[in-house]
Each structure stands twice: as C-alpha cells, then as structure tokens.
Amino acid sequence: MKERIVVAKFGGTSVADAGQVRKISDIVRSDPARRFIVVSAPGKRFSDDIKVTDLLLDLYERAKAGEPFAAELRQIKMRFREIIDGLGISFPLDEEFEILEQSLKTEPMRDYTASRGEYLTAKIVAKYLGFTFVDPAWCVCFDQDGHLNGPMTSRTMCASLLPLNRAVIAGFYGSDMSGVIHTFERGGSDITGSLAACAVGADLYENWTDVSGLYAADPRIVENPETVSYMSYRELRTLSYMGASVLHSDAVLSASELEIPINIRNTDRPEDAGTMIVRHLPSGVVKNPVTGVSGRKGMSVIQIEKVMVSDGSGFSALMLDILKERALPFEYCLTGIDSITLVIRKDLLDDCKEDLFEEIRETLHPDFIGLRENQSLIAVTGEKATESSDANVRVLEKLTSEGIEISTINQGAGKLNLLIGVPEERYEDAIRAIYEFRQSL
C-alpha cells in the first residue's frame, strides 16, 4: 500500500516569529504523513509590522539607487536573529547576510533579493525540524523570461523530493537554466506548494494560514461570515481570482489537474477542520447553493455599439485584436446582437483610453462608444444551482430591491456563476445584500 503523503504549506503569519514556528513543529509532528513542508517569508507579527519581503524589496530599491542600506539590512537580519534565538538553534546568519550584502553591492537583482526571505526561513525551519532543506533554485524551473516551465519543474521536483524522507522547501521562487533567480508574483509560495504536491503525488495539500478556512464573504465587509466547509476547485479559482485572498488561484489549477484535495487550515487553531477543496462533494454532504461572493473595485466598463456586430463580420475578433496588440488584458467580454461590453481594470486604461478609443473608432467605426468608470466586479458562485434553479434571478432581484444599479451581467450556463458590475460606491452594499440572500437559503 502506498504511504500517505501530505504537503503542508505555511504562510507568512505562520512563520512570523519563533512562537509561530514552534506551532508549525507541533502540527508537522502530529501527523507523520506531513513529509514535505513549504514556507513563505516571515509576515506581520502585529498590524503595524512590515513583512520581510517588503523589507527586502525596499532594500533592493535602495541598493539599486546607490543609497546606503546598512540600516535596512540590519533590520532584516534582526528579524531572523530573533526567530533563531527564540528557537534556540545555531544558524550561520552572518555568513548568509554577507552573501546578500555582496550581491547588493555588486549587482542588485530584484528577484534574488526578494526571494531571500523564503530561502532563509526554509533553512531555519528545516534546521529546527531536523528535515532536509531543498532550495527551489534546484528544482523549480523558469525560462529566461521568467515564465514557469511546468513539465521540467514536475520532473526535477519529483527527482529532488521523493528520495528524501522529509524536507522543507522554500516557496515563491526558482531559477532558469543559467541559475538566475526568478520569483512568482506575490502569494507565489502557494504555487510552490501545489507544484510540490503534484510532483510527489500527494494525497492532500494543506495550506496553513491565519484563518480557519475560506469565508463565504469578505469579513471586512460582512460581520462574522460563515466559513465554507467544502467547495470545488472551480469555485475557489473564481473567488480567489476575484479577490478572496486565502489561496493563489494558480495554485488551485495545478492541484485540480491531479485532483489533489486542498485543505485550508489555521496555524493558530489546528483543531479546526478548515475548508476542503475537492472535485466532487463527499456523499451525504449538503451545501448552500451559493458558495460565496467576492469582488474587486477599480474597474471600467466599455460599451461599443454597432448594428449586427454578431452577423459574422469579425467585429468582435477585431476588437480583441486591438486589445491584444496593446497587451491590454480584460476581465470579461460580453457580445450581444448589436453591442460588445468589455470590463477592464481602470488603472490599465488610465494612460491609454483616449488612444484606444481613437483606434476603435478608426478600425471598427462603431455607432456608439461609451465608458463607465469607478465600477466594481462581483463574482457569485455555487455548484448546486440545480437544486435552486432560480438562484441567479433571485440574486439580481435582491440587488434591485436594495436600489443597487447593475451595470453589467455575465451569467454562466447551468451552475450558479454570476459576474455582476455595480458602481464602486455600492460595492459593499452589494456584497452584504448577496450574503444576506445566501443566508436565507
């Protein structure tokens, strides 16, 4: 029988100080299946604290500008010294920081500098646990443009990890064939954990953070929202992409391809079951038709009208080509008989909207082109809409009854999957209204 394998990733709050690292030790040792541990850089210890990665990025900027950085370097070193002393272990911190200092003096590199938080944390945690340290520069493979090479990473991670009994892997970064360090975007340690889980064929990928699972709504907007016990990979990807910050959406994709369950847990409350992310609900589990609601502000809605744009003229394709040539991503595109609606982040439009509109007029000759700014985009998702077939309609009715203007609607087929545009000033009202509707089901 195959030995059970669990990959456990611990986020920044879970390694913020020595006390948190001791909690990691208790969690890891409570289940022998937790063989492979992925860690982030130390996060905030209190609300006004600064994350180590932010300190490192500031350090890089000062070095790049030729400004003195000794004080900033000492501050970062002190963070790690406090963790080491608190754990009562010996660790060559001076040597590690001499290497970092030399790199900053000779050739400052942003990704290399930013990655040193995860690198040092993983070495310290490995030392404390008595596990083998694995540097992802050996096994997380990027190309020279900073894009992940998934197939090569899978092979090299498998070869690096499986022969080991137990290991700690630094999250967030890897390297290209020349040895140059590249990082994922912020939150990328989640991706490292998911890649490791796939490489070793894990039975479970645990993501340990500072909340006991994923909330059905943003707790900064809704007071004491319900924790979701089960949700699908699709639901989590939608909610994560639209602003739910517990897990990086790309991490979900890797695990879902091999149907590895993801369990979001709380380092401070390990007794809580958290949220389980699965392909299909276990038999007998009943869940709310509306799994959750999340969203993002800072959107603009472009409305383009021309008679019979859907008659095979290629109007929509030409519009998307314009965006592609400008490397201008969009959140979604909705095509009607006589119109196209595009939702694009406002900050991406600010410097180019006049030129963009002029190109649209010259290329497509629309009857009308309009712009709505200061919009927000809200995702409402659920897998059980077949049991409440009017859920989509009732969500919209709830918003209308609250006097909330709806600027755009994009509705998926079958399951509950709504993307709704509302003015930014009513964003929080809309989130609360949808959550209130959810709780009434």
Roles of regions detected by a PLM:
Residues 1-248, 252, 345, 421-423:
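Nucleotide/pyrophosphate-binding catalytic subdomain
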Residues 39-58, 264-281, 337, 342:
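Terminal amphipathic helices with adjacent charged low-complexity linkers/tails
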